């Protein structure tokens, strides 16, 4: 991989700046963006049956040991759709990834335990690890988070001293 310049370690930023910033640079930032966008697309696709094949998804949730509640299926679908779109756009990446990491932890703990198999014990844990990485790394390249990090930067760090 690249040198030590591929990972940023800065503590002189505000919590808001750190929330919207990315820890990675260069090729690692590009790879992180590819991971972010690809997993965002996966979650958007996973959300659709929760709305379009709701009764089937509800029966699956019951099979996984969850309560017989349409609200749970709709909430999970809304989380996957909303957070998946956030990942694709690269906005609020850490927050979206945290919500989806909790979702995947729940999927492994329910469907993984009740059903098992390569999907629930392979894909779901891989998505969980991907989300944990995005919580740590941030959005990578080509993300709206980067523009927001710049917007929230103190004026001195943006090169504006306030005088002409």
Residue spans of the language-model regions?
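Structural signature of hydrophobic alpha-helical transmembrane segments
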Residues: 61-75
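Extended, low-polarity transmembrane helix blocks
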Residues: 1-52, 71-78, 82, 89-164
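Short juxtamembrane and helix-loop transition motifs at transmembrane-helix boundaries
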Residues: 54-65, 82-90
């Amino acid at each position: 991989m690249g040198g030590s310049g591929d990972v940023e370690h800065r503590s002189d930023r505000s919590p808001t700046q750190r929330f919207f910033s990315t820890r990675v640079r260069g090729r690692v930032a590009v790879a992180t963006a590819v991971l972010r966008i690809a997993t965002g697309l996966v979650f958007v696709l996973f959300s659709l049956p929760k709305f379009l094949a709701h009764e089937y998804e509800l029966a699956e949730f019951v099979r996984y040991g969850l309560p017989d509640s349409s609200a749970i299926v709709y909430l999970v679908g809304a989380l996957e759709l909303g957070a998946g779109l956030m990942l694709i756009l690269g906005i609020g990446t850490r927050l979206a990834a945290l919500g989806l990491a909790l979702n995947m932890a729940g999927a492994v703990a329910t469907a993984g335990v009740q059903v098992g198999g390569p999907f629930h014990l392979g894909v779901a844990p891989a998505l969980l690890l991907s989300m944990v990485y995005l919580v740590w790394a941030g959005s990578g390249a080509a993300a709206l988070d980067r523009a927001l990090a710049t917007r929230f930067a103190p004026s001195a760090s943006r090169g504006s001293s306030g005088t002409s």
